[in-house]
Amino acid sequence: MEKSMYNSLKSILDKYQELNQELLKPEVLSDIKLYKKFSRELNSIKSISEEFSKYLNYEKTIESSKIILAQEKDEELISLAKKEILECEEKMSSLVEELKILLLPKDKNDELDVIMEIRGAAGGDEANIFAGDLFEMYSKWANNNNMKVSVLDRNYATSGGFTLIVFTISGEKAYSKLKFESGVHRVQRIPVTESKGRVHTSTATVTAMPEIDDDIEVEINPSDLKIDTFRSSGAGGQSVNTTDSAVRITHIPTGIISSSQEGRSQISNRELALKILKAKLYDHENQKKLEKVGQYRKLAGSGARSEKIRTYNYPQDRVTDHRINFSSSLKQIMEGKLQIIIDSLLAEEQAEKIKEVGI
């Protein structure tokens, strides 16, 4: 292992051990915000620290075996020591390659939960129904992975599904697993109302944004906000509340809009709408920064939310992700077995990073 790599790993391991000690301190245990901050830092370097610890243990074993070789006369012990050295060297060589991968640049938001926004797009009623199907797909995936789904806002469509639904998925590295879902999802199928059996094409747009926690500052000037209230509506568009409890917030400088009617009061809806707005503004700034330094990768495509990323072909029972030219069973994917696509996308991301840093 190169000395520079060894020193980097040693610094990370020292930090990991330091954070473990910090998390045991009473002042940290009593401060939820600080505890969450340290826990997130710890989790972000846990894997690499554990693998480097294994490397160091193999290093110590080799040193001990070399002492045996230098001092022992017994041929059997010498043979065992040589064998152990060879085995440890092989394992260390393998670990070096793993550690190179773990040292690759990481998205600072990967540890966060995710806010998903799905909108029915081209195709009228069928697009809205498909938006509902996508929500069910992500909900089933979350359930399969012991993650929690919480709806922040939704507008029911008259023929089923949603014109818009916004929800969080909370769980281990939720954003890292769903960040490549942003883009246009296209569906090809025969609508229930189609009498001639023709296949229709419709689309829904998905936006995946990191959920902002207390550690991340998003500056919002109250004077930049336009806040409107309106009555909550349910399925079919009927009013479900006699008071103006739903809240819509417009960020005037960017034109970004967020809303919520899921809460039981205007106050709770305002908090939810503000939560969505913060995520949108944070995501907006991140997109601008990436665009400025030209860091869009193949998986992010052009960075445009209008880019078609996936097709769901019902007649052929096939889902195709166009960015990696990967196809899978539609039935399984819609049942929430999305991990096969997620893993393929993450593998492609890793390959791109390796190419960039020249490993």
From Swiss-Prot:
Chain ranges passing through the membrane: none
InterPro entries tied to this protein: PCRF, Pep_chain_release_fac_I, Pep_chain_release_fac_I_sf, Prokaryotic/Mito_RF, RF-1
PROSITE patterns given in the database record: RF_PROK_I
Xref: SMART domains: PCRF
Superkingdom of this protein's organism: Bacteria
GO molecular function term, any single one: translation release factor activity, codon specific
Modification sites for N5-methylglutamine: Q238
Entries under PANTHER family matching the protein: LD18447P (PTHR43804:SF7)
Protein name, as recorded: Peptide chain release factor 1
Organism of provenance: Mycoplasmopsis pulmonis (strain UAB CTIP)
